[in-house]
Amino acid sequence: YQGIAMGNKDSKQVYLTFDEGYEAGYTEKILDVLKENEVKAAFFITAHYVNTNADLVKRMLEEGHIVGNHTVNHKSMPDLSLEEIKKEVMDLHTSIYERFGYEMKYIRPPKGEYSERTVAYCQSLGYTTVMWSFAYDDWNEDAQKGESYAKKKILDNIHSGAVILLHGNSKDNSNVLAECIQEIKAQGYTFSTLDQFER
């Protein structure tokens, strides 16, 4: 079904993606860091996110990032009927299109939960399912393990074709992002976007 989880192992491209369920005050800094380092990323947003942070979504788009669908209510897709999935995906799709004139085409299943049925159905709706090759426990705001932990986790898991999943609500990530990007580039990697994805 042409889903994306890991890119070409022989090509030194890496892909940076963020999941944005709600805003904790760090996304502006993340966008600043990406801009300063000339890196384009993908941000997967929920309806709650765009309804409360339309200005940040607008900035993501204006600065050339991909905005992806993380569904209206962040429900596990395998539990839903096709009709419910369609609503979860397309209501957000329509909302983003009406507000920003932007047609989303990548989806990240809530909680990373999917099945062949959901991936195939999302494809029929015009969506490529995007998973990841690396994620870590950065999403829990109450259990941030420190910047050196975050940096080590990220840098230890970089490889050709890596699809990196970070959460926009992580204070540690936002603080070490610039250092990580510079270190990854120094190791000879290029940050590519999902639009340039190499299988």
Describe the predicted segments one by one.
Residues 1-80, 84-98, 102-104, 196-199:
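Active-site beta->alpha N-cap acidic-glycine motif
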Residues 19, 34, 43, 67-70, ...:
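Conserved, mostly hydrophobic/aromatic
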Residues 24-29, 75-103, 113-160, 173-179:
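Alpha-helical scaffold elements lining the catalytic groove of polysaccharide deacetylases
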Residues 34, 60, 122-125, 184:
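A generic structural signal for well-ordered alpha-helical segments
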Residues 37, 63-64, 125, 160-161, ...:
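Structured helix-beta-strand junction loops
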Residues 111, 132-134, 167-168, 195-196:
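Short secondary-structure boundary segments
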Residues 162-168, 172:
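Catalytic cysteine-centered active loop of the rhodanese-like fold, especially the PTP/DSP P-loop
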Residues 170, 185-199:
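Low-complexity, Gly/Ser/Thr/Pro-rich intrinsically disordered linker/tail segments
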